[in-house]
């Protein structure tokens, strides 16, 4: 990295010349050194079909660059113009009720429609040709927030592509029928063309149909990203990304497979700071070895016509920025620079108001810039320490849980809650996609992944055999790749590999079921598995409710390491304490060295450089915190010596400690 970026999303096409110049001047004063432009400007670039002119944006990029501000240019494909959509319902997105989306509000077109793909390729080619080699253009963003407002499309184009996808996957219809078990409810198909989309139906569609359609849709949107990236690379060497999210119906691992760096948006409040940190720990690993970007976060609050959050507490924005840079980000950017005077998001927080004055978040933006300048030399001379503990993250698992949410489960909430238990123990951690290598890790958690591929099981079991500890569950391994039930044993290949026998799987009632582990008794909930206590070493036993007397937490030696099966989810305060005790127990057994006793609400981001180990300590919750320094070190901000022992951190404060004897 050559610099840290501090930026904003900017829409010069919405403003007159005088306002644009005012914006650029104030950006320089604030310290904004990058902007993102163009993602919603298709009708400005091509007001009439076939009449494309991107000269305005060429001029803007040049003017910004002359003022020391670099640009990430976007393709404008979320917002096809009215000439594309008017009177052409076949080009539009159809939701699961087969309702056709109208023009406007963005993402109204079906991204699989062949005419959309054709026009998207033409506008992308024109932009890349004209702007691709400009000085000041440092990157490309494809589209914006794929599937933000929509999920799977049910139009006729998608139906045809769905049938093609099924043919490629199964070859002959008999294989599909066998794999899905379509004899249920007389659902057997005679041709691929008979397989429906999971649209309106009297009751629930078949699990296999619902999950496979989601996976099909995820592959289709990724193929659109591939197509756009390929076009841009013909005319530009600048790296390509997409502004993604874990909230949407996409497979981010697949989406970023052919892109150059990972980026996303997050609007986590101070009360939900763990979600902000989760994103940093995940997106750092989607393109390993490359810094990630936060392309959108609010300088104060998020809002639309129908909802609004509250402004951040003073200091929280700085804590977000410093923690993101410390955890591997190169860019920290706001949505948006100047409040929009019209549209659906006129009430959204911004850096400047629509009338050009500082907003409620302005002083916090200035604080971020002061912090960026202060820590930039440290960040540029170090890199994040390799974590020794990892947690598996899977967007494909999200599809399975969307199909089968049991009692209203949400994948994101499950993952965030489990992540918080690891975070609260002070362990430096990674969230890694299913396909990530396990080199360098000692401890692996794999919760909430209903289907585990054979490839993943082989990789994770090899990790355990070589000395790692693999903790799997809850809600893991109980479904096949087709979203059917195993017929050989409860958890299929996972059970066979671990050697731990599953006795029953059933929904535990946390008002009835309790279990005990690590000296803690807690309610148990979620769709659960209980295990034969003779097939492994029992660490947790169901004490009350169905399954009482059987193990819900058990381990078994596997080569030089262990496989641990967590069959149920401890809940409530006692459950959180039990899970954190589990994390600490196995972190000690795995000899995790990259950890601290930092108080909850404060984080330690360890970094390493030529001069050794650096801890960047940041308070996120606004309550202040502390951590024990294992040895003496130098505060790189004050240049004072800090002795080994307790280090206090004030509300939203950050400290940077270079250890004297640690490398």
Curated annotation (Swiss-Prot):
Recorded GO CC terms: beta-galactosidase complex
Q: What is the effect of changing residue 145 to A?
A: Hydrolysis of the covalent glycosyl-enzyme intermediate is slowed
Positions binding Zn(2+) in this chain are 110, 153, 155, 158
> What is catalyzed by this enzyme?
Hydrolysis of terminal non-reducing beta-D-galactose residues in beta-D-galactosides
Q: EC annotation?
A: 3.2.1.23
Which sites are catalytic? 145, 296
**Entry's Pfam families?**
Glyco_hydro_42, Glyco_hydro_42C, Glyco_hydro_42M
Indicate yes or no for the key word Zinc: yes
Which InterPro entries does the record cross-reference, listed alphabetically? Beta_galactosidase_C (IPR013739), Beta_galactosidase_Trimer (IPR013738), Class_I_gatase-like (IPR029062), Glyco_hydro_42 (IPR003476), Glyco_hydro_42_N (IPR013529), Glycoside_hydrolase_SF (IPR017853)
Gene3D superfamilies membership: 3.40.50.880, Glycosidases
What triggers or suppresses the expression of this protein?
Up-regulated by growth on type I rhamnogalacturonan.
Molecular function per GO: beta-galactosidase activity; metal ion binding
Q: Which UniProt keywords apply?
A: Glycosidase, Hydrolase, Metal-binding, Zinc
Q: Name one GO biological process term.
A: galactose metabolic process
Task: Identify which top EC class this enzyme belongs to.
Answer: hydrolase
Q: Gene deleted: what happens? A: No chromogen 5-bromo-4-chloro-3-indolyl-beta-D-galactopyranoside (X-Gal) hydrolysis.
Give binding positions for substrate: 106, 144, 345-348
Q: Which family does it belong to?
A: Belongs to the glycosyl hydrolase 42 family.
Its assembly, as annotated, is: Homotrimer.
Q: What does this protein do?
A: May play a role in the degradation of rhamnogalacturonan derived from plant cell walls.
Q: Which PANTHER family match?
A: BETA-GALACTOSIDASE GANA, BETA-GALACTOSIDASE YESZ
- What this protein is called in its record is Beta-galactosidase YesZ
Q: Which organism is it from?
A: Bacillus subtilis (strain 168)
Q: Which gene encodes it?
A: yesZ
